[in-house]
Amino acid sequence: MKKHSIASALVATAALCGAGAAQAQVAGEVLVKLGWNKIIPKVKSDDLTAPSLPGSKIDIKSASALFFTATYMITDDISVEALGGLPYKHDIVGAGAVAGVGKIGSVHQVSPTILLQYRFLAADAPFRPYIGAGPTFAKFYGTKGSAALTAVTNPGGPPTTIGGDTEWGGTVEIGGNYKIDKHWFLDAAVLKTFISTKATLSTGQSTSAKLNPIAINASIGYTF
């Protein structure tokens, strides 16, 4: 009976170890994720250049979209991740002296990012927190001005349009994933991007702004 109990315990231990190894995130594996991401700009805008009402600024509203990532495990702890997604559409609103005018335009943007990540805890741990950092490329396009913008910048004239630049920035992140089984896992992360841009109006005025958004996302992932 005693020998049988010892043998049973050894078999159970081996089974648990095998299950843990099957669920491990180890060197050479590829992880893909699909989820929802919300970008919350933290705008600090310069004044719109003359001719304009002194103290005229802009703010940019939050936007959400589907996102996806592909991650390669370089070692059991270090990985590189490519992050992309569907375009985001942000409303641009007046701020400062023109805060009361409401929406003055809109802009679409995509911001693919490459992150070098470090994962904590053992490779076979059910939950693994991680940190990351890397470059972000932001492309702004499809920018439109509103009637309110024209009323402020070019009253009585043709509609005012907005032009935006393409910019590079840097992103840091903190997140974690929880393994459901040997392939599937859940993931959540918070990212902070440091980036600035310049908006130029068809009427000649311009403004520069630090966007520095926070992104919050949740996703489901699969390990190959």
What are these regions (language model features)?
Residues 1-28:
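Cleavable N-terminal export/targeting peptides
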Residues 23-69, 221-223:
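Short glycine/proline- and aromatic-enriched beta-strand/turn motifs that initiate or cap beta-hairpins
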Residues 27-29, 63-64, 109-110, 167-169, ...:
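Membrane-spanning beta-strands of outer-membrane beta-barrel proteins
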Residues 29, 38-42, 69-148, 213-224:
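Gram-negative (and chloroplast) outer-membrane scaffold detector with strong preference
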Residues 44-58, 88-109, 139-166, 197-210:
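Flexible, solvent-exposed loop segments that connect beta-strands
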Residues 69-71, 175-179:
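Short, conserved structural micro-motifs that define repeat-unit consensus positions
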Residues 89-93, 181-224:
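Predominantly the C-terminal beta-signal and adjacent terminal strand-loop region
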